[in-house]
Amino acid sequence: MNKLVGLLVSSLFLASILIGIAPAITTTALTPPVSAGGIQAYLLTGSGAPASGLVLFVVNVSNIQVSSSNVTNVISTVVSNIQINAKTENAQTGATTGSVTVRFPTSGYNAYYDSVDKVVFVVVSFLYPYTTTSVNIPLSYLSKYLPGLLTAQPYDETGAQVTSVSSTPFGSLIDTSTGQQILGTNPVLTSYNSYTTQANTNMQEGVVSGTLTSFTLGGQSFSGSTVPVILYAPFIFSNSPYQAGLYNPMQVNGNLGSLSSEAYYHPVIWGRALINTTLIDTYASGSVPFTFQLNYSVPGPLTINMAQLAWIASINNLPTSFTYLSYKFSNGYESFLGIISNSTQLTAGALTINPSGNFTINGKKFYVYLLVVGSTNSTTPVEYVTKLVVEYPSSTNFLPQGVTVTTSSNKYTLPVYEIGGPAGTTITLTGNWYSTPYTVQITVGSTPTLTNYVSQILLKAVAYEGINVSTTQSPYYSTAILSTPPSEISITGSSTITAQGKLTATSASATVNLLTNATLTYENIPLTQYSFNGIIVTPGYAAINGTTAMAYVIGALYNKTSDYVLSFAGSQEPMQVMNNNLTEVTTLAPFGLTLLAPSVPATETGTSPLQLEFFTVPSTSYIALVDFGLWGNLTSVTVSAYDTVNNKLSVNLGYFYGIVIPPSISTAPYNYQNFICPNNYVTVTIYDPDAVLDPYPSGSFTTSSLPLKYGNMNITGAVIFPGSSVYNPSGVFGYSNFNKGAAVTTFTYTAQSGPFSPVALTGNTNYLSQYADNNPTDNYYFIQTVNGMPVLMGGLSIVASPVSASLPSSTSSPGFMYLLPSAAQVPSPLPGMATPNYNLNIYITYKIDGATVGNNMINGLYVASQNTLIYVVPNGSFVGSNIKLTYTTTDYAVLHYFYSTGQYKVFKTVSVPNVTANLYFPSSTTPLYQLSVPLYLSEPYYGSPLPTYIGLGTNGTSLWNSPNYVLFGVSAVQQYLGFIKSISVTLSNGTTVVIPLTTSNMQTLFPQLVGQELQACNGTFQFGISITGLEKLLNLNVQQLNNSILSVTYHDYVTGETLTATTKLVALSTLSLVAKGAGVVEFLLTAYPYTGNITFAPPWFIAENVVKQPFMTYSDLQFAKTNPSAILSLSTVNITVVGLGGKASVYYNSTSGQTVITNIYGQTVATLSGNVLPTLTELAAGNGTFTGSLQFTIVPNNTVVQIPSSLTKTSFAVYTNGSLAIVLNGKAYSLGPAGLFLLPFVTYTGSAIGANATAIITVSDGVGTSTTQVPITAENFTPIRLAPFQVPAQVPLPNAPKLKYEYNGSIVITPQQQVLKIYVTSILPYPQEFQIQAFVYEASQFNVHTGSPTAAPVYFSYSAVRAYPALGIGTSVPNLLVYVQLQGISNLPAGKYVIVLSAVPFAGGPVLSEYPAQLIFTNVTLTQ
């Protein structure tokens, strides 16, 4: 057969192939998804299933609009059109034993709508005890089938959302034939209520299927039917949810690409994969050890290659001379010669050779000499042959005779000795056959002798697996088996043997042909004598030759009865040459062939069947299946299961088909950003499904070769232990230092707790012949033979360019890199099992080049961690460096079938692309008034986490430093990434001046020699070129530099590019004042505490609040244009406040870099770091209007300061307290008593008092300054508020006028009550005593319309008021009820009067009250 076949030959797959006990089934492998308007059914099994016999019916309604308004109608319409056929069948014959078709009742059912998956669904409970009662089903469990339930609650038939769903009992459904609810006497319902008994006793299985009768809803058509669902059976592979066709869950996750749909109709499985199945076993409960038999076959005969492992013949059948040199097979076993003689010893000159064993026929003893022909003579065995059997004909039948060694306790293990010498040496062997001496000359060959045979044979193979499976929901057992287990696999086939004999009266000669082209000769067999000839053949394939063998030793007897009879008898013996034969591997039945002739001379021919059976070594079983053609795209596999506890064989078969897929390699899209920061890398995905070897621990497993039970046979198979690694890669690439991996003789596992958890067992581990190279720069997996000879080298080969790929250390064992596939995620039936994708993360960086770890310098290519490579290159080699990945499949089948097309090997190159770096000024023009012009270097490959710096040094060198860059524990290395080539200025007259890049010049030209990355990982760094420094170095002024061109040139080592930035230097206008506004300070005027004169006290000005701050507006359009996209600010550099008693100042000292504050006394109040004076902020980006204000405040205090009369120009003292302070960075700094700066303008006892202050302010834009004067004025503030007595009290009066308030309520004053009650408060805490001044006017002498008297008062009085500690809103005394004393008013005539009240600090003093200043009572009656 041609080895290379197509990826899928569907027509051949679907052929019915007889294997073992039943044909391959062609039913659905996996329940197909539900199409729009269709229906499907799923058996609810597995972990979390709440009961047995639950079937989920799903109708896809995605083709119509479903909303809250119509969901009830949609559910009822859909459910009313679902019909279910429930039946019972004989599991062996398929005959129907009962059937009923049911529908849902019009009410009383449980149905739901899933708004995410857009399906209507209903769960029916069919089996006891839930045939008549509902069972609750958690949404978390149902989400395995309907993932949308994880994110949204379903709606029930009433339209309400629910948190769980309930089943509809089978017994509540309506029999469509009667229109009535099915009765308990219904045979199907009766069977379902006793399903275990029915299955075990009557071989019954229960089957249900659904049909959606055709209907129209929302203008869309609905119809369809489900796959049959088997509820229970005696012991079968379930057809739901996984069907009898087994499948790998990775198939339905897109990993088969265009072949994904095969999972539903044609279950293809790649080699060495976990495949899923569900068994229904009503005989079992709890944990059951199952044995699975896998039968492999392909259509038609196969062409197989075999090689001669041994030639065994009686000495009379050997040529008199021939050349021979033993061939060493892949496992180290050597081919040998077997010479049968009657001599007790053979002689070779002076050398005497002892026999390896002997056998006896009819009393005559024959000696067997097993010899390897090599370079020396040895009396010590070089290898052994186990259980060599000779069949011989007798007069009536064929008899077997084992060849024994009487000197050995293991009498069937025959030693093989070596004879020989240098090439060309002739060995002459002498021995007898019967009584005739024979001499044979063997010349030692210069090349090994290997005889090959080719045969056309119809082959099949059988393998066994064992796994202990437990369940929480009998009778369903879900498990996983291996598609091609590493176990002893029996490969069998049928051929023929043909013989032609020439018979004479005294002797006969014959030729025997077997295995198509293997010919054995028998020369001159005398009558009544025996003659022997035979071969031992081994598979003629590099990886498995010498591991297993088939022995054919044929004995011939020439006899005379009534006819001349030439009889042949041959043994057919499977052998494992490196292992003792397994207990179940017995000699096959002998074959025989007889040639008869009534008279001689005569020539006769004959034919007889010949059997072939190889038992593979577990570690090479997969390779053997491939080499023999039994695993490939034409492979059909049937699987039977055996319940070892109940001794039951599955009634039906599971099945799957083989598939071999070539690998592919790809990268996720990437650009320069994949190579910048430490967490950036390129992901390379290698797709090689057939090579999945080592899944993650949660989905991996171990196999052990242990005795298994299958029917009445004891066989050996692979016992699967989930939870640990299957394969144990180790070893060193090459021909030496090979470590196969020691067998683990004892397993210790925890108790089984789930379907895939391990059990305790003891045995020997079989490792697949698949070991890993430990050189991470040339990471190979390779199939290596037992003697260390590599056969298939595969895996990932990596070549780094342009620098060599050296390891980070000189250690002899740097460790090897596992290519681990990803793990499948929930809701995969086997979460954690391997996917067919290997994800390899590749970092390429120059940033840690030259870093050291211990004593080792980091550079080149090395492994950072599992599945992660780092390629470290010099910065000058970074762009254009690449990693060339060559992936050779590690799967033998892929190599075998795709070798001729080369598809077994794929390539990918990951290269670092170039980028466009940029050196630029922010504007094509630069105002010369700026202190410096920004210069930006944008180089993406310089990008790194913050902070990252570039330092400029002598000659313009740029040193890159990124202290926070760490890649797998290795920090970045400071390195030179480029240099400034030149800085020049071309004047307006065309003259170009180049500035030498000396240390002094660099320090003058660059305000900061360190540029910081502006944003993490973006690679943009900001520098600044000093305009003043440029003027200094060129000895030019602003006018001379006007309209000149500044040029900077930089060379980048990483990209190899030379970058140039230019800007035109332009002289622009200075800043100018546009507007300014005065500040306002409020004072509270009162009188200094009583001084002994009741009618006079000195004025006391208490500073209370700054009600308005001084502000300025400047125009500086040129400054704004330096960065028109940003809102800029002008800085204040000096503020001097000049007042009545002196001046205070706040200024920035650019030399010291400090802000200095001095008060009105000339004292330094504070020295602050940096310029903390207020700034003027641009109103909008680029508009050039800047505005800002000074921030003054009043700091209250109790220190009363006397203001000299020389300052106030009065004849009396003036007092003040409260300090004027400036606010900087949120903190107030006192400049001195506010009254020493300014006082309100008031007239006090005929004298004018008052003064303003002036703030002299200097503003700078970094180039020029502007100074302006802004006044600060003072206002007198009167805090006392008066209000008439009212209930409830209203104080202060709401909405009262500032000056006068007339109260026209009736007031009566009697001689007994010469008082007037009012309420008094202060809007600021007022701690001093004050007077309520009362003036009384006759009503006829007061104009109430103007609020003014027309004559002098007829009475006045003063009433003292004081509250402790203070009067006022927010104090403990918010207001006072004051009785204004009017003693003596009764002396006035009775009549109508007007009383005017106001608050004064002392008698005759200024008014302290406001809102109103005067409280006027216009309706006062005085009685007598």
Swiss-Prot record:
Record localization: Secreted, Cell wall, S-layer
Keyword Metal-binding belongs to the record: no
Keywords, ordered alphabetically: Cell wall, Glycoprotein, S-layer, Secreted, Signal
Location (main, coarse): secreted
Residues of the signal peptide: 1-24
Glycosylation site residues: 60, 70, 276, 295, 342, 358, 377, 468, 517, 545, 559, 581, 633, 714, 875, 914, 955, 989, 1018, 1042, 1093, 1134, 1197, 1217, 1252, 1276, 1304, 1419
One cellular component term from this protein's GO annotations in UniProt: S-layer
Protein modification: Glycosylated. C-terminal glycosylation sites are modified with a heterogeneous family of glycans, with the largest having a composition Glc(1)Man(2)GlcNAc(2) plus 6-sulfoquinovose (QuiS).
Superkingdom classification of source: Archaea
UniProt key word Transit peptide: no
Assembly behavior: The mushroom-shaped unit cells of the Sulfolobales' S-layers may consist of three SlaB subunits and six SlaA subunits.
Family designation: Belongs to the Sulfolobales SlaA family.
Protein purpose: S-layer large protein. May form the highly ordered outer sheath.
The protein's name: S-layer protein A
Organism from which the protein derives: Sulfolobus acidocaldarius (strain ATCC 33909 / DSM 639 / JCM 8929 / NBRC 15157 / NCIMB 11770)
Taxonomy of the source species: Archaea, Thermoproteota, Thermoprotei, Sulfolobales, Sulfolobaceae
Gene: slaA
